């Protein structure tokens, strides 16, 4: 029978000092011997997805205490990728994931906590907490802050839905006047919550459901809706139950490495492909797998991407549907139900509710008339009122969206496309693979040949695009922006947004060893591995080279012979500063240099290179 980890600090005369300190936090005699549960919150006023989380930790804590546990809350950092975008702040985004993971590990292990409730929401916070949970392997439940409502504005006498990317595009589109741009900007992000499309934050919160580590509705229930309060309360109650099962009944099935096992990672990736999630999710799933010693690799993702259809199309891939529409259609469990009916899901994987994922799907599938509670739950919708407050409205759609032929979520027979929304490409510039979000690529450019335009920083590429130096048929190559080369693997949302604003969204491609925002669409290929700074082939492409992208064949490369490529490699190796940008002025802080020293390329999740830390 496993002993409570917290007993190390609460039991025995020699721990009198520790108990004295625990008492100073509010603990009483009767609390020593109860499970001490860490509530890892991520409240900050910098991030709309986290601005409403201040009271959520205490909401969970009171629920934990009512169920018989002791709750202790702490906070992690949280970076807003949208605000950090387009300047040197973006260098810090991905490295913050490792700091979040480390901070959770530090707090939980330093104080010998018995379990964790992770209150996350935006881009690097959920992945960082997931990585920590897989490292620690103690009972955990995730509960996110939820997505924001879609923005809405009236243009040409029509009400249209908006998100952050619409504001960015309008800001540089010469066809949009100042008044229209200002209206879009003021309307794009109307409430607290993670940005309203299937961007990185919402994608990751959806994936925690598929991994079995969060409750039904976690990925799709709006931040503003009153029903979301129930998820926080239930998380507090259920984590105490998981502690009871593990510490009192020796039930190891409740541990995250047993719930989020290899099959669960396949389920999560299948969901990601089916819903056309952010390419960043691949990076984060691979990182979590490494931390949990789960043998899930890019090869598995490549295999799944060839078999899983695209069942749910959401902004930025279409303006028609946002997360509130996904929720109305049955949320994550609605998509998983269609995957299950298509024979593309492992329905026997465990879940934090103590059931299999298949059982949870059956209970929450809105296409089954007997699930009246699910139909009511998934009718929760937006109020259309600007607010930063959680649980501030209780509006409901008249009906749920159960249309699997033409609705937001489709059956396999009515899929948006037979192949899913993400693909892995290989070739001489990405020997270990690269990623494209096919859900956002027009079919007319699934095969594309163009002229390489080489830029060794995102800033230089942006200047060239805005100066109209990039023309139709060009392939913009941005390199030395990987985890090590950036350092920090910046998101390239501004270059792709500006290409779209210039009318080049279907006429150009962008290839990088950096990454993309979940808001990116178009022929945008990232995560080229190995990255240029690690000797990757992307570092050998020259200005004016012909390059070819072939999504159906999963191929990408520069159109030169192996002999020419090898000659370029030898020349690079013999240069004064091999595998470094030739003319880039960028001040890199000591903190970022420390990150770069251990960073692996994207195909390994950009985690630390453990081989460099071996005894």
From Swiss-Prot:
The organism's place on the tree of life at top rank: Bacteria
Enzyme Commission numbers on file: 4.2.1.9
Primary role: Functions in the biosynthesis of branched-chain amino acids. Catalyzes the dehydration of (2R,3R)-2,3-dihydroxy-3-methylpentanoate (2,3-dihydroxy-3-methylvalerate) into 2-oxo-3-methylpentanoate (2-oxo-3-methylvalerate) and of (2R)-2,3-dihydroxy-3-methylbutanoate (2,3-dihydroxyisovalerate) into 2-oxo-3-methylbutanoate (2-oxoisovalerate), the penultimate precursor to L-isoleucine and L-valine, respectively.
Tagged with keyword Metal-binding: yes
Organism: Pseudoalteromonas atlantica (strain T6c / ATCC BAA-1087)
Protein name: Dihydroxy-acid dehydratase
GO cellular component, one term: cytosol
PANTHER family in the record: D-XYLONATE DEHYDRATASE (PTHR43661), D-XYLONATE DEHYDRATASE YAGF-RELATED (PTHR43661:SF3)
GO terms classed as biological process: isoleucine biosynthetic process; L-valine biosynthetic process
């Amino acid at each position: 029978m496993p002993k409570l980890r917290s007993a190390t600090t609460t039991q025995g005369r020699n721990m009198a000092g520790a108990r004295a300190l625990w008492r100073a936090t509010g603990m009483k005699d009767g609390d020593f011997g109860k499970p001490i549960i860490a509530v890892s919150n991520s409240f900050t006023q910098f991030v709309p997805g986290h601005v409403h989380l201040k009271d959520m930790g205490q909401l969970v804590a009171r629920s934990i205490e009512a169920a018989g546990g002791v709750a202790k809350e702490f906070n992690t950092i949280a970076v807003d990728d949208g605000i950090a975008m387009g300047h040197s702040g973006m260098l810090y985004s991905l490295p913050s994931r490792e700091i979040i993971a480390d901070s959770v590990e530090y707090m939980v292990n330093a104080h010998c906590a018995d379990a964790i409730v992770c209150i996350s929401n935006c881009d690097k916070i959920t992945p960082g907490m997931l990585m920590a949970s897989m490292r620690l392997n103690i009972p955990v439940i995730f509960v996110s802050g939820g997505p924001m409502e879609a923005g809405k504005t009236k243009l040409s006498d029509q009400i249209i839905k908006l998100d952050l990317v619409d504001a960015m595009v309008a800001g540089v589109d010469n066809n949009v006047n100042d008044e229209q741009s200002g209206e879009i900007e003021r309307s794009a992000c109307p409430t607290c919550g993670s940005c309203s499309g299937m961007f990185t934050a919402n994608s990751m919160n959806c994936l925690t459901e598929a991994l079995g580590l969060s409750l039904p509705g976690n990925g799709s229930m709006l931040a503003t809706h009153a029903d979301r309060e129930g998820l926080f309360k239930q998380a507090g109650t259920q984590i105490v139950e998981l502690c009871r099962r593990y510490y009192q009944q020796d039930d190891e099935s409740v541990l995250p490495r047993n719930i989020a096992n290899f099959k669960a990672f396949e389920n999560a990736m299948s969901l990601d492909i089916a819903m056309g999630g952010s390419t960043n999710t691949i990076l984060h799933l691979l990182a979590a797998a490494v931390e949990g010693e789960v043998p899930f690799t890019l090869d598995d993702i490549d295999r799944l991407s060839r078999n899983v259809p695209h069942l749910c199309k959401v902004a930025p891939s279409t303006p028609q549907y946002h997360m509130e529409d996904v929720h109305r259609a049955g949320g994550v469990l609605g998509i998983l139900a269609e995957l299950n009916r298509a024979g593309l899901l492992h329905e026997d994987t465990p879940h934090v509710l103590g059931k299999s994922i298949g059982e949870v799907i059956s209970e929450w599938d809105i296409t089954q008339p007997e699930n009246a509670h699910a139909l009511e739950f998934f009718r929760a919708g937006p109020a259309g009122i600007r607010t930063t407050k959680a649980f501030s409205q209780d509006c409901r759609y008249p009906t749920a969206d159960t249309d699997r032929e033409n609705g937001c979520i489709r059956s396999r027979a009515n899929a948006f496309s037979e192949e899913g929304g993400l693909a892995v490409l290989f070739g001489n510039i990405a020997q270990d693979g690269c990623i494209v979000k096919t859900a956002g690529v027009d079919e007319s450019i699934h095969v594309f040949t163009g002229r390489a335009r080489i830029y060794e920083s995102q800033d230089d590429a942006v200047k060239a695009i805005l100066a109209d130096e990039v023309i139709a048929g060009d392939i913009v190559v941005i390199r030395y922006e990987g985890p090590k080369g950036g350092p920090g693997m910046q998101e390239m949302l501004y270059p792709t947004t500006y290409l779209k604003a210039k009318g080049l969204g279907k006429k150009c491609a962008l290839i990088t060893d950096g990454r993309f925002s979940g808001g990116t669409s178009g022929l945008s290929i990232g995560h080229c591995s190995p990255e240029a700074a690690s000797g990757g082939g992307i570092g050998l492409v020259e200005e004016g080279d012909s390059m070819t992208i072939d999504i159906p064949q999963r191929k990408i490369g520069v159109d030169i012979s192996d002999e020419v490529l090898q000659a370029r490699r030898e020349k690079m190796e013999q240069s004064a500063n091999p595998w470094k940008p030739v003319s880039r002025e960028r001040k890199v802080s000591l903190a970022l240099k420390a990150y770069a020293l251990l960073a692996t390329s994207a195909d390994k999740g950009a985690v630390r290179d453990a081989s460099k830390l071996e005894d």
